[in-house]
UniProtKB/Swiss-Prot annotation:
Pfam family, any one: PBP
Residues spanning the signal sequence: 1-22
Organism expressing this protein natively: Homo sapiens (Human)
Protein name per its UniProtKB record: Phosphatidylethanolamine-binding protein 4
Membrane-spanning segments: none
Biased composition (Basic and acidic residues): 209-221
Length: 227
């Protein structure tokens, strides 16, 4: 291989590494901003990967490279739970607790994705293969509704047959997630995480919420999700 070809190959590999790793200077407008305060308590053991962004868990989708628009059309992310047990089966839930807005969440929870019967060995590798009760719906926060949290939960299924009620299948909004969990005695999640984004047409100068002093304290993950 000639030196010219080697230089071209090296340049291509370097560019690929930069895209895959998503490394950005902390002062760059495209740097991933981490969630703060109580929102970080939600991030426990789960990893969520989108194209170009990498692991977006516990971060804000940056307002650069049209990421906030791209994420509305990307297919489902890769979800990994490194702590999954090979012989177990799991349930994956993705919801938006801030529908139509975090200030007035009248349609909490909006169900974006629900998959059951996921093998632990697959979940550990990021392969979400199972019974899809609600097909993946990409984050699409309404204009002027502020930042939305997109939350992912993994529950241990323990051989239970999981299903949605007919009325739950009619709409994704105003889903009574707590009733669903109680109906199947699912208990606390094995892992969880979340990220934030807002409508891509909204002002990029708006900051993701950092303080929630007016919101009540909660005792468990399911209650934290509802705040």
């Amino acid at each position: 291989m000639g030196w010219t070809m080697r230089l071209v190959t090296a340049a291509l590999l370097l560019g690929l590494m930069m895209v895959v790793t998503g490394d950005e200077d902390e002062n760059s407008p495209c740097a991933h901003e981490a969630l703060l305060d109580e929102d970080t308590l939600f991030c426990q053991g789960l990893e969520v990967f989108y194209p170009e962004l990498g692991n977006i868990g516990c971060k804000v989708v940056p307002d650069c490279n049209n990421y906030r628009q791209k994420i509305t059309s990307w297919m489902e992310p890769i979800v990994k739970f490194p702590g999954a047990v090979d012989g177990a089966t799991y349930i994956l839930v993705m919801v938006d607790p801030d529908a139509p807005s975090r200030a007035e969440p009248r349609q909490r929870f909006w169900r974006h994705w629900l998959v059951t019967d996921i093998k632990g060995a697959d979940l550990k590798k990021g392969k979400i293969q199972g019974q899809e009760l609600s097909a993946y719906q990409a984050p699409s926060p309404p204009a002027h509704s502020g930042f939305h949290r997109y939350q992912f939960f993994v529950y241990l299924q323990e051989g239970k047959v999981i299903s949605l009620l007919p009325k739950e299948n009619k709409t994704r909004g105003s889903w009574k997630m707590d009733r669903f969990l109680n109906r199947f005695h699912l208990g606390e999640p094995e892992a969880s995480t979340q990220f934030m984004t807002q409508n891509y047409q909204d002002s990029p100068t708006l900051q993701a919420p950092r303080e929630r002093a007016s919101e009540p304290k909660h005792k468990n993950q399911a209650e934290i999700a509802a705040c």
